[in-house]
Amino acid sequence: MEAPCPDKIWQDAGGAFAIGYVLMGVVNIGLGFKRSPPNKRVLYTFALLRKKSPKFGGNFAIWGSLFSGFDCTLSYIRKTEDTVNPIAAGALTGGILAARSGWKHSVQAAAFGGIFIGIIEAFQHMMQKRMQAQQEEMTQQHLEERKRYEEERKQREGERKKLNENGKSKKNKQQQNGENDLD
C-alpha cells in the first residue's frame, strides 16, 4: 500500500538518497582502488567515499522528491492513478533539472525522463500481468486439488459406511445364528 502523497514524497526522497549513496559508494570503491597509489589505496578510497557519495545521494534525493511531487500533483489534478502520471512526472522532472542548460537540453532531458519512466512502467505492467497469471493458475490448481480431496474423502466415507453396514449385518447374522443354535 502506498503512503499518502506528503509521506510518499519524503519516503521517495530518502529512498533515492540511499540508492544514490550506495551506487556512488560502489563506484568510488572501484575507482579508489584503480586510481590510487599502491601504498595509499584504502585512504584514497575512503576519501572518495566521504567526498562524492553524499553529493551523489543528494542529487538522487532531489530527483526523487521532484518526481514524487509531480506524480502526486498530477494524481491530484487528474483525479486518477494510472501510468500517465509517472511518465509525465518523469518528463517534467527531467525538464526541470536540465532547465539551466537551455531549452534544447531541457526538452531532451524531458523526453529522456518520460521515455525512461515509460519503459519502467511497461516492465512493471508486464511483470504484474505475469504475476497475476501465475496467481490465477495457482488458485485454479488449489481449487482442483481441493475438489479432488473432497471427492476422495466422500469416497472413503462411503467405503467406511459400506464396511460398517457389512460388519453390522454379519454381526446380526452371527447373533441370529447363535440364537438359533441355542434353541
Curated annotation (Swiss-Prot):
GO terms for biological process: protein import into mitochondrial matrix. It is found in: Mitochondrion inner membrane. Residues 142-168 have a biased composition (Basic and acidic residues). It comes from the Eukaryota. Residues 174-183 have a biased composition (Low complexity). Residues 131-183 are annotated as: Disordered. Keywords: Membrane, Mitochondrion, Mitochondrion inner membrane, Protein transport, Translocation, Transmembrane, Transmembrane helix, Transport. Residues 131-141 have a biased composition (Polar residues). The keyword RNA-binding does not apply. One of its GO terms (cellular component) is TIM23 mitochondrial import inner membrane translocase complex. The keyword Glycoprotein does not apply. The chain crosses the membrane at residues 13-33, 57-77, 107-127. It is a multi-pass membrane protein. May be involved in the translocation of transit peptide-containing proteins across the mitochondrial inner membrane. Belongs to the Tim17/Tim22/Tim23 family. This is Mitochondrial import inner membrane translocase subunit tim17. It comes from Dictyostelium discoideum.
